[in-house]
Each structure stands twice: as structure tokens, then as C-alpha cells.
Amino acid sequence: MKKIPVILSGGTGTRLWPLSRKELPKQFLGVASEKTMIQETVLRLRYMDFSDPIVVCNESYTSIVYEQLRDIQVDSPYVIFEPERRNSGPAVASAAFLAESFDTDSVIVVFPSDHVIRDAKNLAKAVEEGCRLAGLDKMVTLGVKPTYPETGYGYMEIYPESSDNTCYKLKTFVEKPDEKTATALIQKGNYFWSSGIFIFKAKVFLSELEKYSNEIYKNMKKAFSKATRKDHCLRLESESFKKIPFCSIDHAVMEYTDKGMVVPLDAGWSDIGSWHALWDYQDKDSNNNVLLGDVLALDTKESYILGKNRLVVGVGLKDIVIVETEDVVLVANKNRVQDVKKIVEELERKKHPATN
């Protein structure tokens, strides 16, 4: 039974704007370390017994993907290029069709390319348990115990019965709740954050996809069968692909399947999906600030300040995010940074070049 890692790398990372842009989104940036996020994701695979990875990304990122993987001595990954963004459901479907063509009993382990994990060895233990369950035809997701009412994550309710606390049966998904709802979910105690890491047999996923999201299944099957192939590179056929609905893996399958299981992940995980999440992840000074670049802060607490090109000075600030780049300065309340995505949408509507 092959175990094949699938790296999802097609997102645009709009909530980390203005650092993350369409042409160079956060997975290709060194946001949390000197290496880029996709490089860190692939390097974590060293702790696990995997076959060569499958990377799924947009066609526009072709050269970036190959260049960054070559830099870490990954010379021959399988790469699937999507003509357009369609979210994680179709992306995983394309990888599942490819993995099934290698080995009809293969297990795929899906990793977003833009998350950070401090403890790769604990991740490997959770993945090993997930692969055991996947071998029993279960559909597994790794869940993280919530530490605060984050509104940018999906939440998963579990049936609390477990013989050894290594896995739980999945009950329901809750899509990105508001703060009041998130607080209530945490207090109940039987909810996890969805880490975005999924483990299942390719054929089991495709069977469930055909059952619950047939439009994705049938059109991806056509796009895959008509794909252009060269060496380890596969370009999905555009006409069929464009008929595929935009859909997350949660909405496509995980909300409906009766095979869902949750394996707890305690490995210092963060999806770095917002400036608040990045502030939460990084080391702080004695005033709980993250100060990066040419920055001076006076009487400032609980803030994130990044200066890329100029001196940035903060005086008397609390819970503030300041991000200075060559062409944009973002100033936001740290508790409102989820709304950065709305700013990007408005700029895109106005066709402003700052989104590129």
C-alpha cells in the first residue's frame, strides 16, 4: 500500500495581504522561517515513510514550484497544474485520480502548503495513526484542540467516546463561525479545529466524491483522462475542468460521509491564515509584540509591526497590526484582520494593481 503525500499549493493567501499577492502568494514566501512555506511542508515529509509527493497548483505558479523544490533537492515531484482555482475539493480529486493510477490501494495524505507545524515528529505520529485508519477505509482528518475563538477556521464536532483518545468518530463540521459561536463551541469541549490535513485511500475518496459531489467527480474524471502529460507533469484539460464547481473538500465530501474520523494533532500547528495567526505563532518581546524589520515601538503592546523598506514607528499602540511593503501600508486592529480579505476583494473590484 503506497502512502502518497499531496501538497495543495493553489491558494492566493489574501488574508496575509499586502505581503501575500496573486503573483507570489504566502506558500511561496518565507513567512515564518527562512525557507518558504511550501519548502517547509515538503521537508516535513522526511519524518514519514512516503512515496514521491504530488503537488497541485495553478498553471501560473509552474516555474515557482519547480524552482523552490529544486532548492531543497526535490527534483522530480509529480505536479498537477489546474487551469483555474477551484478550491480543495477538486484539487484533491485530481491527486486521487493520479494516485489511484499508481496503486489502486494507495493512501493519500493531503497537506496544505501554507501551514506551519513546530513538531514534525508529533505530526508523523498522528499521520501514522491516520494511515492505519485509512487502511480500514476510514476518511481521516487531523484535528487541533482550539485555544481561542478563531473565526477563520472550520470546527469539527466529535463523538466523545474513544477507547484510547487516539481517534474519534466525526459528527459534524461547522464552517468558520462568528466569535460568539466559536466561544460556545470551545466551551462544549468536543470540538476541534480542522487542520486541513486529510488521510484516506484514493479510491475511497473518489467513491464518496462520486456519491456526494458527482459534478466534481465526473468533470474531474474527464479533465484527468484528457490531461496533457510530460514526464512527471500533468496539465488538466481545460474545457471539462471549467465545468467543475468551486468547492472545499469539507463541503464536497467530509460533511456527508459516514466514514469520517478525527485524529488529534498536538504539534504546534497554525494555518497562518491571518496576521493575528502569524502574531500568535511567532516569538514575542516582553510587551507581547512581534517587531520585524526597521521598527521602533514605544508604549506598545500585543501588536505586530513589520517594516520591509522604511523605518516604522509605533507609539501607544495595543492590538494593532502594521505591515509596510514597497507599495502598501496596512494598519488594522489585530482583532479585525480577517476583514483584510474584504479589502482585497474591493481592490480587485477596482482593478487596483496592489493585489498582483
Q: What do the PLM-derived regions correspond to, one by one?
A:
Residues 1-7, 14-22, 30-112, 116-121, ...:
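Conserved N-terminal catalytic core of the sugar/cofactor nucleotidyltransferase
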Residues 1-2, 203-356:
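Left-handed beta-helix
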Residues 7-9, 56, 109-112, 141-145, ...:
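Short beta-strand segments
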Residues 28, 38, 95, 114, ...:
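Residue-level signal for inorganic ion chemistry
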Residues 54, 108, 197-198, 270, ...:
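A residue-level structural signature of the nucleotidyltransferase/glycosyltransferase Rossmann-like core
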Residues 74-161, 199-200, 206-213:
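Conserved beta-loop-beta/alpha segment of the NTase-like Rossmann-fold superfamily
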Residues 158-192:
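A short, charged helix-loop
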Residues 191-202:
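Short loop-to-beta-strand entry elements in the cores of soluble alpha/beta enzymes
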